[in-house]
């Protein structure tokens, strides 16, 4: 997708625009106009190839996220349909993501420890979502934007917690396996679907903190392993023997507990980082 559709140009009247992400089924644009700076998301179906099956849900994801953001009371949210799928427009959040903020911690020979305040700000953003009765379903470092005043939790297309109109909804089939809780992986392997939960979000946050601070995934499997093999490693509990330094060490280990009931709640995570 090299150009924005007419419906977006009419809605935003951009004076500047930049495509920042172009992947199968989705493009994201940074757009600036007289009314401010916005993120524009376009979804369209993924066509089948010899390497992957066709996917229709990517066409619905932007509108589903837009509907959820609207229900959560977010401001300046617009979404709708275009000829190949759906779109949404939402405020642009300035700042690097969690993985980039902790890049110096992962440098060879670095003695810089991950800042607990950054971890707390990520936990607080997830706590705000859980407090409204929603689970995110796709917790990963790239979805925590560390802004100058607060951390923003973005990409809510897979969130669950309330009704979504039938024409915009689709089943949850897991997320990026690096951050997928064992119970989610097990359900996806068994049935092809799963149900996001706050407990699974806690696991995802723990895995996101671990890889951002150390460079290591929580679970050990080959880098080029198929997703089914990755998920089976998660189900088998092949936890990598890596921990975070300082106060984050025991906390992240608890967040990565195999049993969901053994993980702290998000409020307990925030309290532990005060």
Task: Describe the residue ranges of each PLM region.
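Short beta-strand micro-motifs within the conserved protein kinase catalytic domain, predominantly
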Residues: 76-86
